[in-house]
Amino acid sequence: MSLNFLDFEQPIAELEAKIDSLTAVSRQDEKLDINLDEEVQRLREKSVELTRKIFSDLGAWQVAQLARHPRRPYTLDYIKHIFTDFEELAGDRAYADDKAIVGGIARLDGRPVMIIGHQKGRETKEKIRRNFGMPAPEGYRKALRLMEMASRFKLPLITFIDTPGAYPGVGAEERGQSEAIAHNLREMSRLNIPVVCTVIGEGGSGGALAIGVGDKVNMLQYSTYSVISPEGCASILWKSADKAPLAAEAMGITAPRLKELKLIDSVIPEPLGSAHRDVPAMAATLKAQLLADLKDLDGLNNEELRNRRYQRLMNYGYC
């Protein structure tokens, strides 16, 4: 699988290309008198060192690019690696089944849980089918149906957030996009079950918040959470999307900044080079965080859960 190096990763890409070239030569001609193993190992160590150096000083815009990386693991990838016995549940029982939202019942280390998450696509047809991870009202109403089911059967709710935002099309607005999001915000704050939310990629505005009101809110190290995209902000303030890097820095969209503002609980570290470099390792780290969060919440009664969740929602936008 191609790593799809980003612009700021080009020095790493060049080193990796040299490693691949030397490795290929070594495999194709085993009769070479020159042993390339030492050189390959040296370059690999240099690549790790360079990656560590570059990723130790990333700007907000570079983090935004990583959050959108085409190989970044999505909700279904984490479901595959973290949970067992997943049974997807479809439809909002009113209009349609929105593929931009996936959800269902599964087991986390043997414990039954309800999972809801945004789902983007990788190939062109899947991207269109998933609407690029931008849910319509029926997607949020499907999510609400699963939340209510989880509450009825006392299943902890785990959500994965990864969306540019709610779909802004005319049809979505006609079917009540804002009402669907608002309804979810209200009902999530009232759920009588533990709710753990994790931003795994992009956390775009109300489209993210509609499944993001939790007792614990986490972000992966290279994910983002914001009221608008950097490009959208730049277009409004400077009339040019080219100012997106400047907007990203000003908006405070990164996990460490949001942790500093007490808008999230935990920053979950990613493997060196971001989550797509080592999906199993990323999934293992995320699983450990989910288990720890549920253990913390198990000691709280329903009223305590509701109060802290509601207070978190009310604190958004206030410093």
UniProtKB/Swiss-Prot annotation:
InterPro entries: Acetyl_CoA_COase_a_su (IPR001095), ClpP/crotonase-like_dom_sf (IPR029045), COA_CT_C (IPR011763). Belongs to the AccA family. Keywords: ATP-binding, Cytoplasm, Fatty acid biosynthesis, Fatty acid metabolism, Lipid biosynthesis, Lipid metabolism, Nucleotide-binding, Transferase. Acetyl-CoA carboxylase is a heterohexamer composed of biotin carboxyl carrier protein (AccB), biotin carboxylase (AccC) and two subunits each of ACCase subunit alpha (AccA) and ACCase subunit beta (AccD). GO terms for cellular component: acetyl-CoA carboxylase complex. Pfam families: ACCA. Residues 35-296 form the CoA carboxyltransferase C-terminal domain. It is found in: Cytoplasm. NCBIfam families: accA, AccA_sub, PRK05724.1. It comes from Serratia proteamaculans (strain 568). Pathway: Lipid metabolism; malonyl-CoA biosynthesis; malonyl-CoA from acetyl-CoA: step 1/1. Its EC number is 2.1.3.15. Component of the acetyl coenzyme A carboxylase (ACC) complex. First, biotin carboxylase catalyzes the carboxylation of biotin on its carrier protein (BCCP) and then the CO(2) group is transferred by the carboxyltransferase to acetyl-CoA to form malonyl-CoA. This is Acetyl-coenzyme A carboxylase carboxyl transferase subunit alpha. It catalyses: N(6)-carboxybiotinyl-L-lysyl-[protein] + acetyl-CoA = N(6)-biotinyl-L-lysyl-[protein] + malonyl-CoA. One of its GO terms (biological process) is fatty acid biosynthetic process. One of its GO terms (molecular function) is carboxyl- or carbamoyltransferase activity.
